[in-house]
């Protein structure tokens, strides 16, 4: 049995832990927060600050098969980069690609340098889409409809044309020479631009080629998530994130049969093969529902989940998994899968009925 050590116990960590378990791996978690969200979901939990006590992590690396940073704490990532040669196992992370991807201005300059279509900067008239230079895609993002609202923005805020359309995502895993473009997904967003649901999409040759080019020109050794908008103007790449994603990998797993943790391991050991055809073509629904006042189920995004106190499995049967995130209001992560959309929809109805029976949820 392989063992993976995850540095970070929030939602990225949950996704990586979930897929590691699906691959039959043991999960060791390291987080400086004694109340780390997934502390009870991991097989082993060690609470310490890797920056203050790196020797503990280096010692752990002697008895695990890989270390995977799954956090967006820049100080932590930069510190791990500074000691990466001291680990006794591979660190499944491309630090240079992350340096480019976390800086949205650097990312956009990179897109332009290789001819990737992206929203126009500082358009002459509204609506504008504004976002901080270095946060996750949804944090601090909003639409501005009036020029006067630009006046209070921080100088380094990105101001782009607002592009209407569907938000789509595609993961790429590279070994530095070969780049496996995996499975397209649709990211369903709420009014705060946070994702509350993910579903699979058919293959899109243009998006796949662009994602391959983005990985190959780095060149990527690790995993990267490419996000784009499909709208009336065609495809526009909005960002890349060179770190293990949350939410989309589970949908990739059930719809394509590809486990991104296993693929990432191969990138640092045997190498990856470029994917010509997806091995499976099934359907999956992944969504977050908050149990609100009067039992009403409310779609919510990751920003709500991240405020929870504990996250673990609540219910399981073939084609259905439900996870409970405890907090002021419970949030359920619902995962349904089947051979097609119809079968998966029936699983979803069954899963919702479980919440009705056990919690009195209003459907």
Curated annotation (Swiss-Prot):
Pathway connected to this protein: Amino-acid biosynthesis; L-pyrrolysine biosynthesis
Keyword S-adenosyl-L-methionine: no
Binding sites annotated in the UniProt record for L-lysine: 11-12, 72, 246, 302
Record key words, sorted: Amino-acid biosynthesis, ATP-binding, Ligase, Magnesium, Metal-binding, Nucleotide-binding
Cofactor note: Binds 2 magnesium ions per subunit.
Reaction catalysis annotation: (3R)-3-methyl-D-ornithine + L-lysine + ATP = (3R)-3-methyl-D-ornithyl-N(6)-L-lysine + ADP + phosphate + H(+)
Residue positions binding ADP: 104, 131, 138, 160-163, 239
Recorded domain comment: Contains two adenine nucleotides bound at the active site. One ATP molecule is involved in catalysis, the second adenine nucleotide functions as a selective anchor for the C- and N-terminus of the Lys substrate and is responsible for protein stability.
Listed NCBIfam families: pyrrolys_PylC
Protein name per its UniProtKB record: 3-methyl-D-ornithine--L-lysine ligase
